């Protein structure tokens, strides 16, 4: 084994409410009627091409999967994503663990995002009690019912919000 084995007894989960979160949902959530940011011609061409491919796929009854990283949620595009799903443009989603963490934290606490540099240095990065507890509780409960990660966590977020 390379390095030192982690002593799990030394990990002390901390209350999420005490974390200095860097963004609130109100600060980052992009309204559906917001004016799109200006982008260059090359990028706009890529967006147009992608939109055309999505339209063609859906017109032909094909599935469209969107695979995205945490920054989509972290930077406030949740309503846009929800709208694409609700209107049938996207049929499947895939993200990483950080994407689901931001989604859950915004829904539960109304804020998310921590300073990686500071919190890694203090050994507190990712040690937030409620985030770990409730996401894993949702996954366990959903797993018992035969649900996958996304369905189980989505049900938990939609039906068991703190507020």
Q: Where is each model-derived feature located?
A:
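Metabolite-binding pocket within alpha/beta catalytic cores that recognizes anionic/polar moieties
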Residues: 2-40, 48-150
